[in-house]
């Protein structure tokens, strides 16, 4: 192997610090880095505004009412371009396919019979959709309630039709639109129907997905070709766009799933993924919610122990795991322990930094008062904290990538170690500036002449760290392709 093709894994701390300082002096923070994600966080209000734009566009193009345009969009997957093309090719065909009939309006007699119950009602108590069949208020209310309460939301477009029977077994094909729902449905039913429209809009957009965290009511709109698939919402929770699990870049979904299957388990109560106990015991405790359960069968540990005399849990998985560990060679075992220790420690450090974010918000409020700065001008402090969290997350998963490298990929292993050490040094420098250099300004009673210099330094350190972090992600995602060696094949990893 050519020694010049591999960067040594032993990193001198002083050299790294000099590297960071030199980068700051040379203005490397302005260098172009890898492409970042362009993800937009959308609240329900934002989504409804986008829906309204599409509804208005279709309404203008087809000369349909907004309620009819909404019906058209919900039936045809909210694809405005496709609807316009189909409408131009044959409007009547499109109308028939979604149940928008084009018939003469009924006469305005004072009395008329309901087409559903057959009873006579004043004209003002009757209403019809595009078919013209008059239906009384009671029948509309009952019909809408039955469909929305009994049928799956995915089938509402199939069942929300005029209730009049036009034959022995056929019902009227005319669809019920939003205007009829708004007039006759209960408050709860209106809410459910509007939520259905909201969900169908997001579910039919290729670049849009709901945030997977429980309780989140926002969606993420990801611009095409925006780099790796790790995105976050306004709650600063990152997830993978492709598999909707916790963010795991720079490793792919398959590798992350394999590692998590063997080394982490979701808490049955709060769903947070918990790393495996380092002593390999089955008794797991979720610290956020204090739930105690079995690693393998997910049974509540306390309930399972009733009548057994304490922590006596018999689980066949324990024997299987011990057998698997026994089959590992000593070198494989050492590689695993080293990887798991670094993966777990970076996960814990990341969680610690996340827990520290509210403190940064408090500090920003304090500095806004003492340094006479707007809160928006102090967001560089929060950005530094968030960058540290992101670096810890990426470091965590680079160790998983390293574990699955083949044993003969020595060049990649050495380059990865060097890259990890450099990124850790960037994080340490940024963290030192954020925590140590920031502290004196918290106790100032009046604006400090040195605060602007601190702002410049922290901002540049954050930018420099971000650039290095993004290049680490890019390099690992590309399989450390910069390592060229005749002795190494181009395979993606070991034990795949």
Curated annotation (Swiss-Prot):
Keyword Repeat: yes
Co-factor binding details: Binds 4 Zn(2+) ions per subunit.
Binding residue positions for Zn(2+) 1: 114, 117, 136, 139
Zinc fingers classed as IBR-type: ranges: 191-253
EC number: 2.3.2.31
Cofactor: Zn(2+)
Ligand binding (Zn(2+) 2): 131, 133, 162, 172
Entry comment describing in which tissues the protein is expressed: Preferentially expressed in roots.
UniProt cross-references to SUPFAM superfamilies, sorted A to Z: RING/U-box
InterPro entries: E3_UB_ligase_RBR, IBR_dom, TRIAD_supradom, Znf_RING/FYVE/PHD
Residue intervals of every RING-type zinc finger in the record: 114-172, 267-297
GO molecular function per UniProt: ubiquitin-protein transferase activity; zinc ion binding
Pfam families: IBR, IBR_1
tRNA-binding listed as a keyword: no
Record: residues binding Zn(2+) 4: 267, 270, 286, 289
Source organism superkingdom: Eukaryota
Residue ranges of the region described as TRIAD supradomain: 110-319
Residues that coordinate or bind Zn(2+) 3: 240, 243, 248, 253
Record's function text: Might act as an E3 ubiquitin-protein ligase, or as part of E3 complex, which accepts ubiquitin from specific E2 ubiquitin-conjugating enzymes and then transfers it to substrates.
Family: Belongs to the RBR family. Ariadne subfamily.
The protein, known as: Probable E3 ubiquitin-protein ligase ARI12
Native organism: Arabidopsis thaliana
């Amino acid at each position: 192997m050519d020694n010049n093709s591999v960067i040594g894994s032993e990193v001198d701390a002083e050299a790294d610090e000099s590297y960071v300082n030199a980068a700051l002096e040379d203005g490397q923070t302005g260098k172009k880095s890898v492409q970042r994600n362009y993800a937009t966080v959308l609240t329900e209000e934002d989504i409804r505004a986008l829906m309204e734009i599409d509804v208005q566009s279709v309404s203008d193009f087809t000369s349909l009412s907004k309620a009819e345009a909404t019906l058209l969009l919900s039936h045809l997957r909210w694809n405005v371009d496709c609807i316009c093309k189909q409408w131009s090719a044959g409007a009547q065909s499109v109308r028939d396919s979604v149940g928008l009939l084009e018939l003469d309006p009924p006469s305005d007699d004072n009395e008329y019979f309901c087409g559903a119950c057959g009873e006579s009602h004043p004209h003002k108590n009757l209403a019809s959709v595009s078919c013209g069949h008059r239906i009384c208020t009671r029948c509309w209310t009952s019909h809408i309630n039955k469909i929305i309460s009994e049928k799956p939301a995915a089938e509402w477009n199939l069942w929300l039709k005029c209730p009049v029977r036009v034959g022995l077994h056929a019902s009227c094909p005319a669809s019920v639109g939003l205007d009829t729902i708004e007039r006759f449905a209960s408050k709860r039913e209106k809410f459910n129907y509007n939520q259905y429209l909201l969900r169908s809009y997001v579910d039919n957009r290729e670049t849009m997905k709901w945030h997977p965290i429980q309780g989140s009511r926002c969606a993420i709109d990801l611009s095409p070709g925006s780099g790796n698939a790790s995105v976050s919402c306004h709650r600063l929770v990152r997830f993978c766009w492709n598999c909707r699990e916790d963010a795991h870049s720079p490793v792919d979904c398959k590798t992350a799933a394999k590692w998590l299957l063997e080394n982490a388990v979701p808490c049955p109560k709060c769903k947070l993924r918990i790393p495996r106990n380092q002593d390999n015991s089955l008794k797991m405790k979720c610290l956020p919610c204090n739930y105690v359960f079995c690693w393998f069968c997910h049974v509540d540990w306390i309930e399972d122990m009733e009548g057994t005399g304490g922590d006596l849990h018999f689980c066949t998985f324990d024997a299987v795991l011990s057998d698997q560990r026994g089959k590992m060679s000593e070198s494989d075992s050492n590689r695993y322990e080293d990887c798991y220790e670094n993966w777990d420690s970076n996960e814990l450090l990341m969680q610690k930094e996340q827990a520290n974010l509210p403190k940064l918000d408090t500090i920003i409020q304090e500095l806004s008062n003492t340094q006479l700065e707007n809160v928006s001008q102090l967001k560089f402090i929060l950005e530094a904290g968030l960058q540290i969290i992101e670096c810890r997350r990426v470091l965590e998963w680079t160790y998983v990538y390293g574990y699955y490298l083949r044993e003969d990929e020595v060049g990649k292993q050495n380059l990865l170690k060097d890259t990890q050490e450099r990124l850790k040094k960037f994080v340490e420098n940024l963290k030192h500036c954020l925590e140590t250099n920031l502290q004196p300004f918290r106790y100032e009673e009046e604006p400090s002449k040195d605060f602007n210099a601190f702002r410049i330094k922290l901002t540049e350190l954050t930018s420099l760290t971000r650039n290095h972090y993004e290049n680490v992600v890019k390099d690992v995602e590309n399989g450390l392709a910069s390592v060229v060696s005749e002795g190494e094949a181009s395979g993606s990893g070991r034990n795949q």
